[in-house]
Amino acid sequence: MAKVKGTKKLNKAIKKALAPLGVENVKLDTEWSYDFETDTLRYSLTECITDIWFNEYIRDTFRYIVGNTGEDVFLISVLHEIGHRETIDFISDKVYNKCLIEKGKIQIALDNALTEEEAKKIEYKYFALTDENQATEWAVNYARKHRKKVKKMQKAVAEAVAKFYEKNGVTD
């Protein structure tokens, strides 16, 4: 397996692009998350069907088309993860713990899903969990209210990802 090159530069460029939002740490990972203990936004460059479903969920739930302000699903996902940080104090411990339990059940259901349609329904349950929905709502509202900032972030992030892909020989 070839070594991945330029990860530090990519993380640094994304961190710089997200500086207006107070993001201190970013890390390329295999999964998306916001790590509250280390105040780290973890992101993935893996594209999958879930991205399409997330777009559809945003459109159907918030009447927002990803791309309206020039952002792509990657940036709206970044904003979603930041949204977890921004909305965590609005969720009671009881509700948050219930969300964690439901996420475990959802993961088991996804692992056992037999069809794409079944997996989509399960993912929608995940998207609708209180903590996930609030983070997405925050992301959408931020994108709506800060169009110029979002366009600037999108440009910087897209350029950094393109350079990373080029350095690693990734093509469309």
Where in the sequence are the language-model features?
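Short Lys/Arg-rich cationic patches that frequently serve as NLS/NoLS or arginine-rich RNA/DNA-binding motifs
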Residues: M1-K8, K12, K148, K152-K155
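Short secondary-structure junctions
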Residues: L18-V26
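Active-site scaffold of zinc-dependent metalloenzymes
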Residues: V26-V73, I82-D89
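Conserved, surface-exposed functional patches that form binding/active-site neighborhoods
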Residues: R85-A113
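Metalloprotease/metallohydrolase-associated module, dominated by Zn2+-dependent proteases
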Residues: E102-D172
